[in-house]
Regions:
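Short aromatic/hydrophobic "clamp" motif used to bind/position activated sugar donors
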Residues: 168
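Short, flexible, basic/aromatic active-site loop/helix in glycosyltransferases
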Residues: 199, 215-236
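Glycine-rich, basic loop-to-helix element that forms the pyrophosphate-binding segment
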Residues: 145-163, 173, 179, 184, ...
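N-proximal low-complexity "stem/linker" segments adjacent to membrane-targeting elements
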Residues: 2-12, 16, 20-40, 46-110
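Active-site-adjacent helix/loop segment of glycosyltransferases
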Residues: 281-282, 287-344, 360-444, 450-454, ...
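Acidic donor-binding segment of Leloir-type glycosyltransferases
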Residues: 108-145
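A short, conserved alpha-helix in the catalytic core of glycosyltransferases
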Residues: 70, 240-246, 250-254, 258-285
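Conserved donor NDP-sugar-binding/catalytic core segment of glycosyltransferases
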Residues: 179-213, 289
Length: 484
């Protein structure tokens, strides 16, 4: 992967806005995922206040450095008006395809027309190459054919080899783009450090079945309604390449051709490791034709699960089912074994120690306690959701025998497993009753878990099954380090 630009600072004149979770109290700024606490100088606090009010970033190195830090941390997001951004003439669309002719035809119909970028279809060893060629010819697009099937990564690379524009948009053949989909993505490239941007993936013409309605509300490809920076271990840790716009200068060797699953996550993580910024932009939407039959849907989820061990081999320690502080882990462990009072005591101790540390940082005891409660106590409560998801997605082969052997663990484990899907149902309000929504979530988690364990056995690794622990929430938490 090619290294990112030498100048990593935000361009002067950029505008940024606060993430909904960001809080500025005096000179203390908190926010991001994982939550960070920054102690600003008086000038820095005034600058952030001005940015939140809509003022542009000045040309000073200090301002541009701070703005970049806030964007990278997820405390702020860019306000983009299109100034300095590339246009459709700067983009070539590459569609990797293997048969699925009706889907390909629908995809090309959505991509072609007056004012649209040129399109290249990369035929990945289709069984009916004449049909793919006919679909490409009917749409008036260029075709490159691979004699042997090499997987979607290899097909994308073959298409990219013919690209001469400074940007390339990869769109899978089972996708249909909406009018105006490209402009919100291209605006991000006014920042020269941005290497890739992806839109939100939404369902295309969902069928009336319960599974289709579940996928419409909770697809594995849908990263949700909140924009953000993409980084391993962050709130948005990966992007699917069902649709992805990439700066050609950042493409480097491209997608890995020796893996058939997880090549999209691997590509995005290598981009980030090389110094490029990757963004998720839900203001642009691309429709995906989801699987709505149970067997292929289960098989696809299982296939996704096998990618974790493959990615672990390429990005050590980057794939974990659960990220937790040791204080939070101790509190939940105490509660799980029937000692909730002990768990509350652990959380209270962590909060008090953190408040003591933050008092020295902020010089304000009341503010320190508010922050400590949010970071330590609030973080412990919020951990219920990812903990329950980790049990159903990774640890159920151990959790079920444990619940059978230790009856008092049955209710806590069941509550933890059911909490995430029920909370998601309440948040999403899908066109599906809670029982079937929960059933769909748990069935998908089991499918993913089967693939996860299969991949770990093949790769002979346990790391994708192990939680990542830290001292977060303690007085020495990285989240509590001060920065001026």
């Amino acid at each position: 992967m090619r290294d990112g630009p030498a100048d990593q600072l935000i361009p002067a004149g950029f505008r940024i806005r606060a993430d909904p979770g960001a809080r500025l109290a005096g000179q203390i700024l908190t926010g991001g995922a994982p939550v960070r606490l920054l102690r600003l100088s008086a000038a820095g606090a005034r600058q952030v206040t001005a940015w939140w009010a809509g003022e542009p970033v000045s040309a000073s190195t200090a301002a541009r450095t701070l703005a970049r830090r806030l964007l990278d941390a997820g405390i702020a997001h860019p306000m983009l008006d299109g100034a300095g951004a590339p246009g459709p003439a700067d983009v070539t669309v590459v569609v990797p395809a293997r048969d699925r002719l009706p889907m390909l035809a629908a995809c090309l119909a959505s991509l072609t027309g007056p004012g649209q970028p040129p399109v290249i279809v990369a035929d990945d060893g289709s069984a009916d190459p004449a049909g793919v060629a006919a679909a490409a010819a009917a749409s008036g697009v260029r075709l490159v054919r691979r004699a042997l099937n090499g997987g979607p990564g290899a097909a994308r690379n073959s298409g990219f080899a013919l690209v001469s524009t400074p940007f390339v948009a990869f769109v899978d053949s089972d996708c249909v783009v909406r009018p105006g989909w490209l402009a919100p993505l291209l605006r991000h490239f006014a920042d020269p450090a941005v290497g890739a941007v992806a839109p939100r993936i939404v369902p295309h013409a969902p069928a009336p079945s319960w599974l289709s309605r579940y996928e419409s509300a909770s697809s594995a490809l849908d990263m949700g309604p909140r924009e953000g920076a993409v980084a391993a271990g962050g709130r948005i840790s990966y992007l699917p390449t069902a649709a992805l716009v990439v700066r050609a200068a950042a493409f480097g060797p491209g997608f890995a051709e020796d893996i058939s699953v997880g090549e999209d996550v691997d590509f995005v993580w290598r981009l980030a490791a090389a110094g490029w910024r990757v963004r998720y932009e839900p203001g642009s939407a691309v429709e995906h034709q989801h699987r709505d039959r149970l067997r292929p849907w289960f098989s696809r989820r299982q296939h996704y699960g096998t990618s974790a061990a493959v990615l672990e081999a390429r990005h050590p320690r980057a794939v974990r089912p659960f990220y937790v502080s040791r204080w939070t882990a101790a509190a939940w462990l105490a509660a799980a074994v029937g000692q909730p009072a002990a768990g509350a005591a652990v959380t209270g101790t962590a909060t008090a120690l953190l408040a003591r540390r933050l008092t020295g940082v902020t010089g304000n005891r009341q503010l320190a306690w508010r922050l400590a409660f949010r970071l330590a106590a609030g973080g412990t409560l919020a951990a219920a959701r990812p903990l329950g998801a980790a049990i159903s997605r990774a640890w159920w082969p151990a959790a079920i025998p444990l619940a059978i052997a230790v009856p008092r663990l049955r209710l806590p484990l069941a509550a933890l497993v059911l909490t995430p899907p029920l909370l998601d149902w309440a948040d999403l309000r899908p066109a599906l009753d809670p029982a079937r929504f929960v059933a769909g979530r748990l069935l998908g988690d089991v499918a993913y878990s089967v693939g996860l364990w299969q991949g770990c056995i093949r790769q002979r690794t346990l790391y994708p099954l192990l939680p990542a622990t830290s001292t977060s929430g303690s007085p020495r938490s990285p989240a509590c380090q001060t920065r001026s």
